[in-house]
C-alpha cells in the first residue's frame, strides 16, 4: 500500500506541475513534460514549440521555473531541459490548446474540429480523434466526437504510440473540455494493417 500511495502522490504532483506549466508557458506552445528521478535529483524535460520563451533572456525564465518546481512542488534538485517540438501537428497537447483557443475566439466547435483534423491528417498523421464536451449549443451538456483514420484504443500500442492531450475553453455558456488523440505517421503496430482513407466522421452523445 505504501508503494501504491507513493505512485499516486507522484502522479498527482506531475499532473499539478503539468497544469501549472500549461498556463505559464502557453505562449511558448507548451506540449507536455517528462519527469524522471536521477541519482543527482529530478530531470524535467519540457516540450515546447518555442524554447526561447522558456529559457528567457540570460536564462532568467528557466531559473525562475527551477525555483518554483523546487519550492512549490517539492521536486528534489530539479534539472530542466527544454526540447523543441519537431512537428506540433503530432503533439496532441499543442493541438488541444490551439483548438481551445479557437473556441474561445468564437469559432464554431464543428468548424474548429474539422479544420484541426484536416491540418493534422494533411501533415501525415495515421489517425486523429477529437472529443469536445460541455454546453455546446444550449443548456444541455453533450459530447461530440470527430475522428478520421486509425487510433489504437487498447493495449501497449494505445499507451506508447498515441499522443493524447487535454485543454479547456472558457466560454459564456461554461467550460468546454477538449480531448485530442493523434497517431503519428511513424507509429507501427505489431500486426500492421492497411488503413483505408475515409472522410471525417462525427458522433454526438448526451451527457
Swiss-Prot record:
GO terms for molecular function: rRNA binding; structural constituent of ribosome. Residues 17-86 form the KH type-2 domain. This is Small ribosomal subunit protein uS3. SUPFAM superfamilies: Prokaryotic type KH domain (KH-domain type II), Ribosomal protein S3 C-terminal domain. Gene3D superfamilies: 3.30.300.20, Ribosomal protein S3, C-terminal domain. Binds the lower part of the 30S subunit head. Keywords: Ribonucleoprotein, Ribosomal protein, RNA-binding, rRNA-binding. One of its GO terms (biological process) is translation. One of its GO terms (cellular component) is cytosolic small ribosomal subunit. Belongs to the universal ribosomal protein uS3 family. Part of the 30S ribosomal subunit. Signal peptide: none annotated. It comes from Thermococcus sibiricus (strain DSM 12597 / MM 739). The keyword RNA-binding applies. The keyword Hydrolase does not apply.
Amino acid at each position: 500500500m505504501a508503494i501504491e500511495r507513493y505512485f499516486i502522490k507522484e502522479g498527482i504532483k506531475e499532473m499539478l506541475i503539468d497544469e501549472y506549466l500549461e498556463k505559464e508557458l502557453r505562449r511558448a506552445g507548451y506540449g507536455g513534460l517528462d519527469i524522471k528521478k536521477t541519482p543527482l535529483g529530478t530531470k524535467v524535460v519540457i516540450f515546447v514549440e518555442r524554447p526561447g520563451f522558456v529559457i528567457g533572456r540570460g536564462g532568467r525564465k528557466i531559473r525562475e521555473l527551477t525555483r518554483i518546481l523546487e519550492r512549490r512542488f517539492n521536486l528534489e534538485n530539479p534539472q530542466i531541459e527544454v526540447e523543441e517540438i519537431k512537428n506540433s501537428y503530432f503533439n496532441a497537447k499543442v493541438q488541444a490548446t490551439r483548438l481551445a483557443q479557437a473556441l474561445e475566439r468564437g469559432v464554431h466547435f464543428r468548424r474548429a474540429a474539422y479544420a484541426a483534423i484536416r491540418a493534422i491528417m494533411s501533415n501525415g498523421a495515421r489517425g486523429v480523434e477529437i472529443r469536445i464536451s460541455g454546453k455546446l449549443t444550449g443548456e444541455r451538456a453533450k459530447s461530440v466526437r470527430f475522428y478520421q483514420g486509425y487510433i489504437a484504443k487498447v493495449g501497449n500500442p494505445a499507451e506508447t504510440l498515441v499522443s493524447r492531450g487535454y485543454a479547456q475553453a472558457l466560454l459564456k455558456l461554461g467550460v468546454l473540455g477538449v480531448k485530442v488523440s493523434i497517431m503519428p505517421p511513424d507509429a507501427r503496430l505489431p500486426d500492421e494493417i492497411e488503413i483505408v482513407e475515409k472522410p471525417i466522421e462525427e458522433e454526438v452523445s448526451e451527457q
